[in-house]
Each structure stands twice: as C-alpha cells, then as structure tokens.
C-alpha cells in the first residue's frame, strides 16, 4: 500500500509517495514536461528586456504558443552584479538591461498569455558570477513570487567549501565506452549504500524547494545540478525536473553523448518528474538538418523538457518546422501516458552498451493520443546507413502480433516528419538514413 506525506500551504502540495516520490503542484504545474524558450543558448549574458520580449512575441507569432510552448525564461546575468540591496537583501534587476524591472517585463509576457522564468544558483554566486540564492532562499522565493515568476532554473555554481559533499558521485559525462558507464578516475566515491539524500547538495536544493512551496504562487522548479549527488534518486521529490549532465553545446558529439547518458534514465520518467538532458540547440551552430531532427526527436521521445534555445526572430523555416512537429509534441504532452519512449534495441552496439558516440538507435513508446506506437530509428554513424524496425522486436507490438497470429503481420504506418500515410506495412519497415538522421514513425492499428 502506498503511503503519502503531504505538506500543504495555500500555494502548493508536496506529496511524497514511497516508490514514486513526486513534487506535486497546484493546477497540474509540472505534471507534464515543460515547453518554452530560454535565453542562454542564444545570447549567454548578452540579454535585455528587448531580447526577451522579442522571443515572447515570436513564440506567439510563429505559432509556438498554440502548440504548447509557454515559458519565456531569463537565464543568468539579469541582476546587478555588485550585490544585493543593502537594506532589503533582495537581488536587484540590472536597470540598464531591464528598465521596468523583472516584474514589468513579467507583466508584458503574461499579457501575451505566456509564463516567465528566471535563473539563480544554489551557491553564493551564479555561473557568471552574479548574486545567487544559497542562504537567501526565502527572500528570493518571495521576491520571485512578487515579480510574477512562474519558473525557476536553479544552477549549481558558486558552492562554498562548507557546502561541499563528503563524496564525489559518478556522472560518466562524457564517459568512456563501457557497459552502463564507469568513473575509473573517481578518487572519492561514496561507500556502498550511501544515501545521497543526506548529501549537502540535496539539502541545498531542498531549501529552495521548501521556500518555493511556502510562497503564494506556483513556481515550477527546475534543478540544474548536472547529475551530481545521484540526483535521479531524489530529484523528483525536490523539483519538477533535474539536469542529468553537464551543459549541452551545438555539436553532434555532445548531443550524442548526452542522449546516450540520458537513455539509461528512462525508468525515472513519468508524470511530475523529468530527467533533463539540457536545453535544445535546434537552430544553433553548424548542426546539419538531420542532426537537428535527431536532437529534437530524441528529446521529445524521452519526454525531456523542451526549452528552445535559439534566436526566434531569425529562425529558419526548416528549424521552425522541427520545433513545431505536432506528432512529436502530442507524444511529449500525452495527458494519459506519462512514460517516455525507451530503447528496445541499441543497433550499432550490443544492447545496454554505454557509448557516448553511438547512443541507442531503436526506440518505442506507447501513446494515448497518436493512435499507435511512436518508433524512432537513429543512424548514429558518420555515413549513410540502412535501419530496419522489425515489428516483432518492438515491445508495444508483440502482444498485438501474438493475438493476430500468422494471418496478419502488418500495421498502418505514418511518417512523423511528413505526416504521410505509408499504408499497411508487413513485418518490418526499412529506410536509408543520412548520417545522424532519425526516422520517426507512428505504428498504428494492425492490418
């Protein structure tokens, strides 16, 4: 029998269930993975109110709001760098970057029917050296609530020595080729059975959770501690999503390495809790169109938060089409099925191989809204390759095939990228893929 511990305030309920710990918020905030935009990948520290409002307006004008994208998130470098207000101890928005303050900007974003996010860190300074929130959790949570903030990205920089963990957790990032990943150079591992919930890292993040729960506004809580301190074990009871790796970059080797690492964490994904492989790089750098497609499809299939990180006023139609794929977004936002797609076959490698250059290539996931099963086939290699989805290998299709017997071995198939009905496909579907491209299918009713 599942037991629950509830901490109730006017703003939120913290529900802890054995075996399925989750931070449950009012209004279903955080039940589904977040959709939005963030300033960092596009602009870094070079931000101001005009750039944030441009992004907000483009989310509306480009039709992204209608597809569910709702958060407009201000990342690092938004405050006065020299320190807090001496009398109130509050962080102060940079008046040159944000002449109407964060609250004035938030009002404008809310007027568009969107939500607004902000950034801080569980340390003394942010990653760019601005004031952060360790020791000021209650003041900052109250300030964010008063400003109308709806989302907090909480980083892991500026941690003082007295808040450093006693042990070092193994995050094989980028890792080396080995089964499940190892950290052979870790000189300070925790003893067997160590509970990372007791770590100082977990405590730093709990303090902000408790502060956010206590304010009279529901603020989605996005942990960004890079997979440290076994956050997969306690992240769901602390926040709505939690970063699993270091930062992403707009390069295929980095995207592949993160996809590989995150692919081993799919059992942690369900309603109210999402391992986060970092923000999207679609539209950035020198990624090929195929790599942009594969990046987005994998992130959507894993039900990761989909936070756009490119300048929307200059986005190409090809990149916009990827971010706007209705089939992948429907799978991602399924109101009935919380579980993600899972790898069912590694393809290039033997199953369960940890290989940053070649993540799992064959994925499938159930859906209540697509009329079938989502299936992905990735070409992780550097040359054109053929990939084949065999129906009897796909977990969601095995029972159907068993009931049909030998009389019917086909399924109606739809191409996710084109929306084209591919007809009744018997036994398997085979396709030639460019380097680092992905085929995405909805495998529907038997035929």
Swiss-Prot record:
Do the record's keywords include Glycoprotein?
A: yes
Write the signal peptide boundaries: 1-22
Q: Subcellular localization, per the record?
A: Secreted
Q: From which domain of life does this come? A: Eukaryota
Its UniProt entry gives the catalysed reaction(s) as: Hydrolysis of terminal, non-reducing alpha-D-galactose residues in alpha-D-galactosides, including galactose oligosaccharides, galactomannans and galactolipids
Record's function text: Hydrolyzes a variety of simple alpha-D-galactoside as well as more complex molecules such as oligosaccharides and polysaccharides.
Protein family membership? Belongs to the glycosyl hydrolase 27 family.
The protein depicted here goes by the name Probable alpha-galactosidase B
Q: What species does this protein belong to? A: Neosartorya fischeri (strain ATCC 1020 / DSM 3700 / CBS 544.65 / FGSC A1164 / JCM 1740 / NRRL 181 / WB 181) (Aspergillus fischerianus)
Species classification: Eukaryota, Fungi, Dikarya, Ascomycota, Pezizomycotina
């Amino acid at each position: 029998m599942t037991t629950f511990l509830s901490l109730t305030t006017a703003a939120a309920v913290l529900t802890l269930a054995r075996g399925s710990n989750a931070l449950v918020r009012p209004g279903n905030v955080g039940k589904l993975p977040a959709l939005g935009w963030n300033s960092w990948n596009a602009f870094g520290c070079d931000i101001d109110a005009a750039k944030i409002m441009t992004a907000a307006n483009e989310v509306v004008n480009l039709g992204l709001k209608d597809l569910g994208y709702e958060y407009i998130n201000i990342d690092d470098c938004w405050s006065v760098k020299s320190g807090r207000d001496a009398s109130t101890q509050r962080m102060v928005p940079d008046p040159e970057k944000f002449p109407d303050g964060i609250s004035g900007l938030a009002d404008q974003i809310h007027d568009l029917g969107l939500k607004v996010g902000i950034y801080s860190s569980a340390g003394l300074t942010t990653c760019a050296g601005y004031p952060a929130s360790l020791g000021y959790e209650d003041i900052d949570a109250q300030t964010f609530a008063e400003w109308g903030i709806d989302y907090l990205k909480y980083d892991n920089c500026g941690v003082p020595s007295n808040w450093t963990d006693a042990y070092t957790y193994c995050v094989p990032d980028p890792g080396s080729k080995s089964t499940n990943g190892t950290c052979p150079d870790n000189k300070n591992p925790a003893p067997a059975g160590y509970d990372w919930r007791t770590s100082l890292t977990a405590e730093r993040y709990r303090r902000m959770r408790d502060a956010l729960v206590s304010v009279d506004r529901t603020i989605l809580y996005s942990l960004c501690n890079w997979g440290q301190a076994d956050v997969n074990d306690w992240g769901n009871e602390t926040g709505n999503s939690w970063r699993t790796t270091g930062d992403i970059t707009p390069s295929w080797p980095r995207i592949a390495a993160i996809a590989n690492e995150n692919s081993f964490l799919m059992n942690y994904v369900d309603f109210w809790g999402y391992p986060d492989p970092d923000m999207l790089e679609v539209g950035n750098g020198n990624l090929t169109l195929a790599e942009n497609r594969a990046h987005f499809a994998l992130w959507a299939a894993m039900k990761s938060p989909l936070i756009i990180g490119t300048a929307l006023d200059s986005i190409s139609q090809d990149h916009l089409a990827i971010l706007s794929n209705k089939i992948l977004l429907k799978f991602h936002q399924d109101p009935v099925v919380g579980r993600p797609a899972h790898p069912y076959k590694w393809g290039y490698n033997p199953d369960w191989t940890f290989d940053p250059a070649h993540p799992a290539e064959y994925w499938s996931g159930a859906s209540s809204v697509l009329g079938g099963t989502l299936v992905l086939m990735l070409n992780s290699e550097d040359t054109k390759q053929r990939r084949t989805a065999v129906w009897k290998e796909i977990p969601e299709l095995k029972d159907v095939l068993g009931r049909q017997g030998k009389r019917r071995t086909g399924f109606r198939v739809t191409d996710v990228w084109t929306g084209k009905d591919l007809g009744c496909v018997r036994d398997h579907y085979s396709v030639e893929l460019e380097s680092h491209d992905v085929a995405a299918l909805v495998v529907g009713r038997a035929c």
